[in-house]
Each structure stands twice: as structure tokens, then as C-alpha cells.
């Protein structure tokens, strides 16, 4: 239960920190963090396996579960942020397209998007946050 809440709060903080548009450098670091999670899960698994062999405090099946759950939880945190950032990136790409190729309607779309986009972003973050509760419940408590 404690680990479930820790990952849930980490996910909420990471989703709601306000950094929803990434630069090229941030995208590169974000992609490297996915690779880092995979490598970290493998290292954690080997470390846990060696710990069980030297000092048998948990069973092998529990060690396998912990390795899977920790890796899946970190991947889920990154995937939730990826969803939000991709929605913002797609929307800004649509607006750039309209500014360049649909300039006669861009002003109307721009004023409309300035009115609705903050509330739609909050709605998207709420939906993704509710989905993350279900994901972490499935990983840690089910």
C-alpha cells in the first residue's frame, strides 16, 4: 500500500508540474529516461537476485514480482507524462499548421483555442491521473 501511494504521488507531481511542452533537448532526455528505466529495472533485478542468494529474506517469486512492479511503475509514470506532452505537442502543431496554411481562419481558431485550451489541458490531466490510479492499483494492489 505504501509503495502504491508513493508512485501515485510521484506520478501526480510529475504530471501536474506544468512542463507540458518539450524542446528537442528535453525530448532526448525523456527518451533516455525510458532507456534508463529499462536498464535500472534489469540492474535492480540482478541486485535483488544476488541479495536473495546471499541473504534469503524474500522468496524468488517475490523478488521477480518486485522487479516487474518497480520497472512497470516507472514506465507508467513516464508513459502518463508522454500522453500529456504529446497532446500538447499535437495541438501546438495543429495551430502552427493553421497559422501557416489557413491564415484566414487562424484568428478565429486562435481566439477559440485561447479560451478552451487551458480547461481541456486540465481535463486531459485529470483523465490521465484517474487512469494512473487504475494502473498503479493493478500493479501494486491487485
Describe the role of every protein-language-model region.
Residues 93-113:
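Juxtamembrane inter-helical linkers in multi-pass membrane proteins
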Residues 107-133:
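Loop-to-transmembrane boundary segments
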Residues 1-24:
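N-terminal signal-anchor/start-transfer transmembrane helix
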Residues 27-41, 62-75, 114-123:
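Transmembrane alpha-helical segments of multi-pass membrane proteins
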Residues 58-100:
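Short alpha-helical packing/oligomerization segments
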Residues 41-58, 86-95, 140-142:
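Membrane-helix interface motif
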Residues 2-5, 31-32, 122-129:
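Hydrophobic H-region at the start of alpha-helical membrane spans
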Residues 130-142:
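Juxtamembrane boundary at the C-terminal end of a transmembrane helix
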Amino acid at each position: 500500500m505504501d509503495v502504491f501511494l508513493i508512485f501515485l504521488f510521484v506520478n501526480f507531481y510529475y504530471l501536474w508540474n506544468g512542463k507540458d511542452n518539450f524542446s528537442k533537448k528535453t525530448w532526448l532526455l525523456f527518451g533516455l529516461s525510458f532507456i534508463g528505466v529499462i536498464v535500472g529495472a534489469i540492474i535492480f533485478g540482478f541486485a535483488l537476485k544476488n541479495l536473495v542468494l546471499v541473504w534469503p529474506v524474500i522468496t524468488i517469486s517475490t523478488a521477480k514480482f518486485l522487479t516487474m512492479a518497480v520497472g512497470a511503475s516507472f514506465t507508467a509514470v513516464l508513459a502518463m507524462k508522454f500522453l500529456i506532452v504529446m497532446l500538447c505537442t499535437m495541438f501546438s502543431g495543429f495551430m502552427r499548421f493553421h497559422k501557416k496554411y489557413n491564415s484566414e481562419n487562424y484568428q478565429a481558431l486562435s481566439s477559440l483555442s485561447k479560451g478552451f485550451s487551458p480547461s481541456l489541458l486540465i481535463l486531459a490531466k485529470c483523465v490521465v491521473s484517474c487512469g494512473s490510479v487504475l494502473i498503479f492499483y493493478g500493479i501494486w494492489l491487485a
